[in-house]
A protein has these predicted regions:
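Condensing-enzyme catalytic core mediating Claisen C-C bond formation in acyl metabolism
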Residues: 2-42, 156-165, 169, 188-192, ...
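Conserved catalytic cysteine-centered active-site region
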Residues: 13, 73-129, 133-177, 228, ...
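Short, well-ordered amphipathic alpha-helical segments that serve as non-catalytic structural scaffolds
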Residues: 41-57, 82, 110, 179-182, ...
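Phosphate/pyrophosphate-binding loops at sites that engage ATP/ADP/AMP, CoA/4′-phosphopantetheine
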Residues: 50-64, 186-195, 278, 309-323
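Beta-strand segments within the central parallel beta-sheet cores of soluble alpha/beta enzyme folds
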Residues: 60-70, 96-102, 126-131, 198-206, ...
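Short glycine/threonine-rich loop-to-helix capping motif typified by GTGT followed
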Residues: 73-81, 298-302, 331-345
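Active-site-proximal alpha-helical scaffold in enzymes
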Residues: 98-132, 173-221, 268-274
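Polyanion-binding loop/helix "lid" in catalytic or ligand-binding cores
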Residues: 196-199, 203, 207-264
């Protein structure tokens, strides 16, 4: 039996659940921008939460429970229980909450958890928000309005903390190669040249950067790669992305294939679909959420986890990627975005 043979089948929700409000902060770099210097995690979470409340036409007195997501709050914020520190900011003092952290999957699990609480009938209105401040880190014993830049050594420790370190398993999860393992398999399985892989990854970088430059909430990415190329005396984005400014950091990965670190937060509010039209004329019904955990000690872990989660929702809803009008994918690594699109048909 492989670890894929034991995947449970999703069951329909006990009652339908819909999103009635969404909110987000601008995505900033606190230490680089004097206009937001001194902002802290609580303010960012509250900004997104209040924005979602405003979108739904509710306030903290209406929301019954909130969920706080942050990937690794111990290293960026020196907070062990960050959910405890935002209730006063959003008008929910005394109400229930909890915190969760699942690295790149934190946002997805935040949606799943909020939906489960409402679908079960335990609560009628739940807010779920996620906040990240990875561009800088807090001091261990100072107020959180004072921050500092991390070092490469600190970030290496953080990345190592995402790996299984049982006995010799740690040696099988070396970054960034654990993220490239599925891509290398895909390339060899389909007889793709390294030049074609590079062209695909470069095009993804260019398109993602262009989308970020157009996004009004992005305050950190104002220039496309074409503009950066011109600024540095180069003729094209392709030339810039194959220069010293974008070195290889793996077999296929370059610097631009990795995330752009910034500070920000986003939130949603969910309630039973039967109540949703009381708050909005365009609720977003959630049909199902797949979930699979495959840690980096397993070869091609991202590929198997994505396949598993997609298979769950496909079997539950009868829908495939071909039925979708819009498809959004995690692009913490470019190859993750490509993997999701390939897997979800």
């Amino acid at each position: 039996m492989s670890f894929n043979d034991n995947l449970p089948k999703l069951k329909p929700f006990k009652r339908s659940v819909s999103i009635i409000g969404v909110g987000a902060t601008p995505f900033v770099r606190i230490l680089d921008d004097p206009s937001v210097d001194g902002m802290n995690e609580q303010e960012l979470f509250a900004y997104a939460a209040r924005d979602a409340m405003k979108d739904a036409g509710v306030d903290g007195s209406d929301v019954e429970f909130y969920i706080h997501g942050q990937a690794g709050p111990g290293w960026t914020s020196n907070l062990a229980t960050p959910n405890m520190h935002v209730a006063n900011w959003i008008g929910m003092k005394g109400k229930g909450s909890y915190h969760h952290s699942e690295a790149c999957a934190t946002g997805y699990v935040g949606v799943e958890t909020a939906v489960a609480l409402v679908a079960s009938g335990e609560y009628d209105m739940v807010l779920s928000g996620c906040i990240e401040t990875p561009y800088s880190i807090a001091y261990p014993t100072r107020v959180v309005t004072k921050r500092r830049f991390g070092t490469d050594a600190i970030f290496h420790d953080v990345l190592a903390s995402t790996q299984c370190r049982d006995y010799t398993l740690f040696t099988r999860g070396s970054l960034p190669f654990n993220s490239e393992s599925w891509l290398d398999y895909y390339v060899k399985e389909n007889g793709i040249s390294e030049e074609d892989v590079d062209a695909m990854m470069t095009a993804l970088s260019v398109n993602c950067r262009r989308a970020a430059a157009l996004n009004p909430l992005s305050t950190i990415t104002n220039n496309t790669y074409e503009e950066l190329a011109a600024t540095n005396g180069m003729d094209s984005a392709y030339e810039y992305l194959h220069s010293k400014f974008n070195p290889l950091i793996g077999k296929y990965m370059r610097g631009s294939h990795f995330e752009q670190r910034c500070d920000g937060a986003a939130a949603i509010i969910v309630c039973p679909t039967e109540l949703a039209y009381k708050y909005t004329d365009h609720p977003i019904e959630i049909l199902g959420i797949g979930h699979s955990n495959v840690e980096a000690g397993n070869p091609r872990n991202e590929m198997y986890a994505t396949q598993n989660a997609y298979r769950q929702v496909k079997e539950l809803t009868g829908l495939t990627g071909a039925d979708m009008d819009i498809f959004l994918a995690n692009d913490f690594y470019n190859q993750s975005e490509f993997l999701s699109a390939e897997t979800c048909e």
